[in-house]
Amino acid sequence: MRYNQFSYIPTSLERAAEELKELGFDLDLQKTAKANLESFLRKLFFHYPDSDYPLSHLIAKNDMDALSFFQSEQELSKEVFDLLALQVLGFIPGVDFTEADAFLDKLAFPIHFDETEIIKHIHHLLATRCKSGMTLIDDLVSQGMLTMDNDYHFFNGKSLATFDTSQLIREVVYVEAPLDTDQDGQLDLIKVNIIRPQSQKPLPTLMTPSPYHQGINEVANDKKLYRMEKELVVKKRRQITVEDRDFIPLETQPCKLPIGQNLESFSYINSYSLNDYFLARGFANIYVSGVGTAGSTGFMTSGDYAQIESFKAVIDWLNRRATAYTSHSKTHQVRADWANGLVCTTGKSYLGTMSTGLATTGVDGLAMIIAESAISSWYNYYRENGLVCSPGGYPGEDLDVLTELTYSRNLLAGDYLRHNDRYQELLNQQSQALDRQSGDYNQFWHDRNYLKNAHQIKCDVVYTHGLQDWNVKPRQVYEIFNALPSTINKHLFLHQGEHVYMHNWQSIDFRESMNALLCQKLLGLANDFSLPEMIWQDNTCPQNWQERKVFGTSTIKELDLGQELLLIDNHYGEDEFKAYGKDFRAFKAALFEGKANQALVDILLEEDLPINGEIVLQLKVKSSENKGLLSAQILDYGKKKRLGDLPIALTQSSIDNGQNFSRESLKELPFREDSYRVISKGFMNLQNRNNLSSIETIPNNKWMTVRLPLQPTIYHLEKGDTLRVILYTTDFEHTVRDNSNYALTIDLSQSQLIVPIASN
């Protein structure tokens, strides 16, 4: 374990003493440091009628227990404080450590003993994470140190778990959206699942916009998947034009219906544990699946601003700008009298994507988004540089396949009976519009590109993204983060994992940082919390997070690739082609080991190479035919210890998100030896070699200069490392699988790897 503590708010002595007193700690500025520490420790054992017993189970020195120490005349020292602090946080002498000083250095322990600062040390200790993954104060509250009185209690600028999660209100409302996406002449209704604590105070809201939450249709999804085996189409030379079109909602009328009290209820919905954490701290949770999902009406428009509007309508309802009904019969309306109108959206992948889309509308009431692994351009999710390009792990998927997965109205047999014919018509229109034949950018994709509206974002923004996420690739967050207005508060956590959540990792206090931010933005708490704009997980060692100023630098280093002419054959033998098509993981293993069709260049680094931004391959290339696709991957190659990309559980169910509520496991990325690590990758249709809007012809056997931008990253390579460059054609995970007889030739003497270099 290593501390990377970004959430602690430095506090004055007076404020620290006041907050400790509010928690019931009987400390006195006039008492000695030793007396105050003893009083603090005894309060921790509030379950015991006699605190001597648990105090005797701690040691103050290697040869003295804590009870004996406090009964002695010995003075409090750094050695004693450190040893007791470690034990209070759950670290066991002789098991987790033998030498406390060395262990504290390894932990990067954030508290440095000064006898005159004991009150501040105790305050800081309570806000510091235990071995279990919870802060000490959260651990104490989870054990019942504070009663669940359904009111706010704060410590170090963060809300504590004092809302009763055993008496939650669970209700359903149906919000009227200014849409008619299925063109039935009726405004679409959006189902909203609400979970909120009982409270006399207006509550802020965490909203998870999740098209998955009302169910998914995996059978329809699998039937809709596309075969990847097809020839690369030769496209006609042309220029692509698109236009920015404002989304115009339909008109709605003020509602004059009576207020209804008898709301639909529910017992369970698959929740997001970060939401649960905040539910126990006085934040209502709502789950919204949007148009075309079970319980709602309309068509699943998948990614456009009509879908975004269906979520926006819910924020409007929370702020009395839209109508909600008690049921589909629309006999009574319902108001969000319990809400303070301020909203933060949460969720990963599609969920985070909807958060980004919502933010670009500038809707009033949306105070903050926490968007994890989020898409900012749907074209860049399903296409790349003029190619159909499947997201990592999902060959054959496209946006209409995702529509089939998430159009959960068809999971309700009655809805299927009444509406499936119309749904199939609209789905066919969507399949035609996305143009899987050419892979080109068009108006359909432009209408699903949130980057063009990034300037309208006015809420606070928090992004998290994995630099090993080949599903929602790093370009998605790179482009939106760098497009955000300079006038807003923005934050980015870049981790070394894949497509995963990070709120329950041991090495980073993400949960507590979000608590401090949300108390600022949604509760108006003046806590003076300041979070760095960008925090990056160091790839060279375990559990080390660093502040970074920018994602993408203008300083570059050009690396020569060699002097040879290298031939890349596109064609595979029939058996090999079929085998790779059945198992793209076997293809990846062969590719990285230099066995698949490729041109391979290994570069032994003579100095450190700190990459920050978008690597570009500038290549001199020619094709034997009038077509060609180019794929590239950059590897950190050779056996050494690296971070894995999938977090593993360190302890099971050790994190309590409330008071015995919604427990989850503590996780972390493992650090272990492996043979290589993908740093970046990229794909291009050579007919789009100049830009996305220009379709060029490819002259047979004529040299072309190609600039292939790879996925942005921040990655530190050290002197002596091997940088492996792999150039090839068909990628069996991502691209169409064209097995025709053509070859690419690369002139390495006229080619370079252009690397953005991080400054010191």
UniProtKB/Swiss-Prot annotation:
Disulfide bonds: none annotated. One of its GO terms (biological process) is proteolysis. Keywords: Aminopeptidase, Cytoplasm, Hydrolase, Protease, Serine protease. It comes from the Bacteria. Pfam families: Peptidase_S15, PepX_C, PepX_N. It is found in: Cytoplasm. The keyword Protease applies. It is an enzyme of class 3 (hydrolase). GO terms for molecular function: aminopeptidase activity; dipeptidyl-peptidase activity; serine-type peptidase activity. One of its GO terms (cellular component) is cytoplasm. InterPro entries: AB_hydrolase_fold (IPR029058), Galactose-bd-like_sf (IPR008979), Pept_S15_Xpro (IPR008252), PepX_N_dom (IPR015251), PepX_N_dom_sf (IPR036313), Xaa-Pro-like_dom (IPR000383), Xaa-Pro_dipept_C (IPR013736), Xaa-Pro_dipeptidyl-ppase/CocE (IPR050585). It catalyses: Hydrolyzes Xaa-Pro-|- bonds to release unblocked, N-terminal dipeptides from substrates including Ala-Pro-|-p-nitroanilide and (sequentially) Tyr-Pro-|-Phe-Pro-|-Gly-Pro-|-Ile. Its EC number is 3.4.14.11. Signal peptide: none annotated. The active site is at S349 (charge relay system), D469 (charge relay system), H499 (charge relay system). Removes N-terminal dipeptides sequentially from polypeptides having unsubstituted N-termini provided that the penultimate residue is proline. Homodimer. Belongs to the peptidase S15 family. This is Xaa-Pro dipeptidyl-peptidase. It comes from Streptococcus pyogenes serotype M18 (strain MGAS8232). The gene is pepX.
